[in-house]
Amino acid sequence: MSQRDTLVHLFAGGCGGTVGAILTCPLEVVKTRLQSSSVTLYISEVQLNTMAGASVNRVVSPGPLHCLKVILEKEGPRSLFRGLGPNLVGVAPSRAIYFAAYSNCKEKLNDVFDPDSTQVHMISAAMAGFTAITATNPIWLIKTRLQLDARNRGERRMGAFECVRKVYQTDGLKGFYRGMSASYAGISETVIHFVIYESIKQKLLEYKTASTMENDEESVKEASDFVGMMLAAATSKTCATTIAYPHEVVRTRLREEGTKYRSFFQTLSLLVQEEGYGSLYRGLTTHLVRQIPNTAIMMATYELVVYLLNG
């Protein structure tokens, strides 16, 4: 792969990630709040014990719409874009690093394994995910802290630089890498996503090639091709997210301030013991509602930019 090709994939990946992050930020905030252990968004329901006449409070997790309503009422619409700054700072380099690493790794592995085989896509996706996570974890930690910083209207909100200073004063440099073990576990989601995506993309390409050969036409990119890529991305991301979602909840808990959660497996075990298996999928609906369009937008933007820059 030439230096120009690498730069094209870097730029295209950055563009795709940025567009997706801006359009889906409110859903990201709601999802992060639902994943956290914060009690401020919980609802206490009173149940009467008809035998003894006593009342018992039962704490339940709010749904996405209730969470959205609480944020709008107590904090205002601007709170739905909490953490967008770090998100934009992180998403462009993260996606750029990811796509560049993925493309480079795939090109090299094609010389070792069968070109564009499942092994190639799996290893490339894993290596790209590992590289991007290691490089950008501090940015995502700050983003999560800002999104969990619930303040009422009129109260001074914590800024990104204040959050950085607070993390450093409390935990030092290692504090910026909390939750990274859960992110590494999440590489499985990335691998599943790209294997399915590349498989669907290949099938679509084979179908179009066969169609153009039958009609004796030259193969050119059309709007329907990008729609197909968006559907491929949405389908693959839905499957991958549903399978690997628990790591998202664990990661959010590990990134909370002053948390009792220390490691990936300790957090996973504690969640199941204290809140049940359902807690591992808290916020999944919101996450899917956000991730499906976000991934579709990101992948289509990436493919479009690569196509335009390569002429």
Swiss-Prot record:
Q: Note the superkingdom of the native organism.
A: Eukaryota
Please report the residue spans annotated as repeat (Solcar): 4-108, 116-203, 224-308
Tissue specificity = Widely expressed at moderate level. Expressed most strongly in pancreas.
Q: Which residues cross the membrane?
A: 7-27, 41-57, 111-131, 180-200, 226-246, 291-311
InterPro entries, sorted: Mit_carrier, Mitochondrial_sb/sol_carrier, Mt_carrier_dom_sf, SLC25A33/36-like
Q: Which PROSITE patterns match?
A: SOLCAR (PS50920)
What the entry lists under SUPFAM superfamilies is as follows: Mitochondrial carrier
Q: Which molecular-function annotation in GO is an example for this chain?
A: pyrimidine nucleotide transmembrane transporter activity
The UniProt entry lists membrane topology as:
Multi-pass membrane protein
User: A Pfam family name for this chain?
Assistant: Mito_carr
- What modulates its activity? Inhibited by pyridoxal 5'-phosphate, 4,7-diphenyl-1,10-phenanthroline, tannic acid, and mercurials (mercury dichloride, Mersalyl acid, p-hydroxymercuribenzoate).
What does it catalyze? UTP(in) + CTP(out) = UTP(out) + CTP(in); CTP(out) + UDP(in) = CTP(in) + UDP(out); UMP(in) + CTP(out) = UMP(out) + CTP(in); dUTP(in) + CTP(out) = dUTP(out) + CTP(in)
Alphabetical GO CC annotations of the entry are: mitochondrial inner membrane; mitochondrion
First-listed, main subcellular location of the protein, grouped into a coarse class: mitochondrion
Which keywords does this Swiss-Prot/TrEMBL entry list?
Membrane, Mitochondrion, Mitochondrion inner membrane, Repeat, Transmembrane, Transmembrane helix, Transport
Q: Which GO terms describe its biological process?
A: mitochondrial genome maintenance; mitochondrion organization; pyrimidine nucleotide import into mitochondrion; pyrimidine nucleotide transport; regulation of mitochondrial membrane potential
Compartments in which it is found: Mitochondrion inner membrane
Name the family. Answer: Belongs to the mitochondrial carrier (TC 2.A.29) family.
Q: Please name the PANTHER family in this protein's record.
A: MITOCHONDRIAL CARRIER PROTEIN RIM2, SOLUTE CARRIER FAMILY 25 MEMBER 36
According to its UniProt entry, the function of this protein is described as: Mitochondrial transporter that imports/exports pyrimidine nucleotides into and from mitochondria. Selectively transports cytosine, guanosine, inosine and uridine (deoxy)nucleoside mono-, di-, and triphosphates by antiport mechanism. Catalyzes uniport at much lower rate. May import (deoxy)nucleoside triphosphates in exchange for intramitochondrial (deoxy)nucleoside mono- and diphosphates, thus providing precursors necessary for de novo synthesis of mitochondrial DNA and RNA while exporting products of their catabolism.
Involvement in disorder: Hyperinsulinemic hypoglycemia, familial, 8: A form of hyperinsulinemic hypoglycemia, a clinically and genetically heterogeneous disorder characterized by inappropriate insulin secretion from the pancreatic beta-cells in the presence of low blood glucose levels. HHF8 is an autosomal recessive form characterized by episodes of symptomatic hypoglycemia provoked by protein feeding, and persistent mild hyperammonemia. Affected children tend to have recurrent generalized seizures.
Put simply, this protein is called: Solute carrier family 25 member 36
Native source organism of the sequence: Homo sapiens (Human)
